[in-house]
Amino acid sequence: RELARFLGINFTTVTRAYKLCELKGLLQAVTGSGTFVASSAARSVTISTERPRSALIDLGFENPFQVFTDQIREITRDIAGRKQFPQLLDYASPTGMVHQKAAGVNWLKNIGVETDPDHLMLVSGTQNGLAMSLLALFDPGDRIGVDTYTYANFIELARLHHLQLVAIGSDEEGMRADLLERQHRLNALKGVFLMPSCCNPTTRMISERRKKALAQVIRREQLILLEDDIHAFFTAGTVADYAGPLARLVPEQSVYVSGTSKPLCAGLRVAYLVYPDRFREALLQALFNVNVKTSSLDGEIITELILTGTANAMVKKKQELAAERNRLFFRYFPELEGQGHPLSFYRWLPIPDTRGGAEVEQAFQQQGIRVYHSDRFLCGKREMQAYLR
């Protein structure tokens, strides 16, 4: 009303403008606080593999540690010499070949996922799996609950799909179930997006107790759970509290995505997407219409890594490398030790700087260093405390 009076225009015109800006991801309404310009309004916050200039020390992009490249080369050569090789080069089996899906089912058992080939598909990476799920299950204007700081590329996906993200507060155990329920009552959420094994960027893990509390709200309010579990292979067997993904508690309302870029190989674009019967038709239509079929060759290489036991060895080696990198970080920042995931591929560093995120990132780049500021990951009202990932 104040803006309408100031501009001398109709109140309903301003209301419509606010709504359009929210759909475009330019504004974020925070219940009880007001409407704020989104931190990502003036620029894309997408984090990609675009190479920085050679002299730049890249401490921002998440490095998944390339290991066992010689073994991958040999497996690829072996596959290329097989009689069935031509079958891996065509459009057949858009959800993955039967034996590839069976291997995926067994692989996911390592992290507490129980499914079968009829409820699993191979997709071309986690990001495409999430994009396909948003296209299939959500409509423009729908609201999705997310952590206050969440995966930057998901923020951009939501903007592309004209979806509104609603920030849900959290504590040391992860997103608070009571706040999720409250925001659903205020904003009529359709779904919730979570990374329970290791939230990107905060490194926070959702405890088993909190998973059960969140599952109760998701079940009771009939929300759709989108679970990105990219870090689960560094959580299972490492974190004592880990009993499996959140999706196992609400399987009929969940789309669960487990990518292989972090535990295995970033360049092989393969992720496993697990879904219930109720979402099958919509997800398959999205897969066929967008045509994001995973390369059968990539799927076969990942399958061979699993069947030969190389995949397990790769995970173990990466766990060792991640532990070594984290020890190095905590040597310089001992006050942060014990916070977040012990084997995270990134850390969340508080900084005493209240400048805007783009300005801080630019200041670091001028010193030859690339880092990512917390503004990239922010949904909702900006806090006084800022961070670097």
List PLM regions with ranges.
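Short beta-strand "wing" residues that participate in macromolecule-binding interfaces
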Residues: 28-29, 115, 371
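Conserved core of the PLP fold type I
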Residues: 88-221, 226, 233-253
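Conserved PLP-binding active-site segment of the aspartate aminotransferase-like
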Residues: 275, 348-354, 371-389
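PLP-dependent aminotransferase class I/II
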Residues: 253-341
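Short Gly/Ser/Thr- and Asp/Glu-enriched loop/turn motifs at secondary-structure junctions
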Residues: 32, 116-117, 340-346
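Residue-level recognition of strand-loop junctions within catalytic nucleotide-signaling folds
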Residues: 38, 276-277, 307, 350-352
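N-terminal basic, amphipathic alpha-helical segments
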Residues: 1-80, 89, 288-295, 317, ...
